Amino acid sequence: MELSSLIVPNNKKHFVVVFIGLVLIFKIALITAANEKSQIYTVHLGERQHDDPNIVTESHHDILGPLLGSKKASHESMIYSYRHGFSGFAAKLTSSQARELSGHPDVVRVTRSKNMKLKTTRVSDYLGLTSAAPTGLLHETDMGSEAIVGILDSGIWPDSKSFNDNGLGPIPTRWKGKCVSAEAFNASSCNRKLIGAMYYSKGLESKYNGSFNAAEKGEVMSPLDKIGHGTHCASTAVGSFVPDANVLSLAQGTARGSAPRARIASYKVCWNNEECFTPDIVKAIDHAIRDGVDVLSLSLGSEVPVDFEVDRDDFAIAAFHAVMKGIPVVCAGGNDGPEKETISNVAPWLITVAATTMDREYFTPITLGNNITLLGQEGLYIGEEVGFTDLLFYDDVTREDMEAGKATGKILLFFQRANFEDDFAAYAKSKGAVGVIIATQPTDSIDASTVDIAIAYVDNELGMDILLYIQTTKSPIAKISPTKTFVGRPLATKVARFSSRGPNSLSPVILKPDIAAPGSGILAAVPTGGGYDFMSGTSMSTPVVSGIVALLRKKRPDWSPAAIRSALVTTALQTDPSGEPIAAEGSPRKLADPFDYGGGLVNPVKVADPGLVYDMGHDEYVHYLCSAGYDNTSISKLLGEIYTCPTPIPSMLDVNMPSITIPYLSEEITITRTVTNVGPVGSVYKAVIQAPQGINLQVSPETLEFGSNTNKTTFTVKVSTTHRANTDYLFGSLTWADNEGHNVRIPLSVRTRVFNFKI
């Protein structure tokens, strides 16, 4: 070969350089794509465009296939096709592929999958849901016998007595779901009570690249509940009657759910490593809509949100489709309290639940040598009484003393410095101690000790009282008695310390939580031990409300999810059933306000007859989406129909919530609400205003009249402030009252913000 043949003529040099550059760019792109890590993304396509689910799935591959290069690649990438309640799919994509897909004309939103966390013998009677009463919500709905509650959780333990089908009629004919046989679970375990059991693990398995080892995690790939959370929640919502339920002889009584004859559809989406992946949750919601559930109950949630949730949360978008099809979605508010702005599940179409205590508590008596008895709380000690013996303050005992046996036969007082109370109890026992008193911050949870030693928990204030006794007594002694159950007065209800608080950090105009229910020390079914155990959390308060909602669905079948939420809020109690004000645990303790418990404590005695409701449907939810900044194209795709937001864009303050929350009041504003009469024709209501301090409220009209041709009317509220400086939130209420016993109350939360700063 001649050298001249290797020389590029001048007129071809630019072409060759460009060609080589394109090849390099293409290779770099291939290397980048190969090296870019795939993750699971959910592609939301809004309402279904076809009735045939198979055509819907095929349309998903038509969208994904061209992006990935072939239909085969699309099938390999896609882990779920959402094709029943709405349209969308979950697939393994790189971030660049997800960005490209988000620009597709049929796509509403592309979101990366998230991990969500899992967040009785007395509850129903405490709330007034008395099964023996000849009238009331339980009696009028046959205890919910035709209702189907979908529980999205950690599965179900079908052998629990709480899921017996004694006395139940046939499975409702509208039910389209099924029970599946899988590892350690036989479909024959289902009955007329447990009518559906499915599990969803593709999101979980994809996260682990197919290497998830269920056995190592103490799990089984089936609907079977291995951790007890789903079983506990299901029995709290709709558990059958079970006499003599108890934990170590505590809280003995008849266990039952809020709707004890309702049916259970269990959708396992959470696993023993506390992982609940949104693609699995969304698929379960898709199936639940198809199956015919009346209520969805989800005792789980994400971390405190940092993005606009409706825009970023797969679950919130899927729940929107369920609500638009008439299915209320009840969710846990979270366990990150008592700090403010910790509430999760804040979309306005969700019913978000806070947790309270109730009038049943468990105390471990501690008697000092001066005959003063103090009541330890939150821990359970079931054992023999430890009689009077020497009481020592742990900080006064050296390690050498402990090794020498100074603690033998004695009780130790210990101030918790970290989350090591069980470790300390085990350490004390190993050194011969017969009992420990642990002073700590209260949690409002109920837990049995895992160490075989007498143990009592007190708050730091009582701990200081005990320490003072030790330091001022020559020979301090004490005894610890077994835990006892106390019911009724003088135990007052309080919002539990762990219950997440508002205001809503994403859309502060939307009040969250909506409602509160008992969630501390709830006794319900579990897979192991004696079959029942205590659990605490908004996970436990959520199914209490879900069961009540199931009863409402049967009592008021024409009510929308928003009407049900309104009835819960406007009939709620601000005092406990004995008439005592509800406090909120925290630092400091205070009277509860709307950011602690929404409308208040759920009141099933009144909830079916609220008089008026603040309803929301298609137009009201679109109003919210417009005010939240969604564009017309995204809203149209979400709804499955062409929609154009009005001009000017409506204010989020006018979203027809059963509450008014104004985070930035600087000048007079006017807020609009619409109420629908669900009471007697001819009802007349008058406004009763409890204005927040320094806030002026003017309601127009002050009287609402509902005739035979008028069941809906609109009123306005003018709000202004007399404050001349910024304030924290101030609280009040607006109540519409008639002469028939209806008091339709909504909470008001107003914060003054003065913006005329001079620089």
From Swiss-Prot:
Q: Which GO terms describe its biological process?
A: proteolysis
TM region positions: none
As recorded in Swiss-Prot or TrEMBL, the protein's gene is named SBT3.16
Glycan attachment points: 186, 209, 371, 632, 711
Sorted alphabetically, the keyword list is: Autocatalytic cleavage, Glycoprotein, Hydrolase, Protease, Secreted, Serine protease, Signal, Zymogen
User: Where does this protein reside within or beyond the cell?
Assistant: Secreted
Q: Which residues form the propeptide?
A: 34-119
Originating species: Arabidopsis thaliana (Mouse-ear cress)
Coiled-coil ranges per UniProt: none
EC number(s)? 3.4.21.-
An annotated Gene Ontology molecular function: serine-type endopeptidase activity
What protein name is recorded for this chain? Subtilisin-like protease SBT3.16
Would the keyword Signal turn up in this protein's UniProt record? Answer: yes
Q: Which residues form the Peptidase S8 domain?
A: 124-608
What GO terms fall under cellular component here?
extracellular region
Reading the lineage from the top rank, the first entry is Eukaryota
Q: Domain (Inhibitor I9): give its ranges.
A: 41-118
Q: Where is the signal peptide?
A: 1-33
Which residues catalyse the reaction?
153 (charge relay system), 229 (charge relay system), 539 (charge relay system)
What family does the entry list?
Belongs to the peptidase S8 family.
Q: Write down the top EC class of this protein.
A: hydrolase
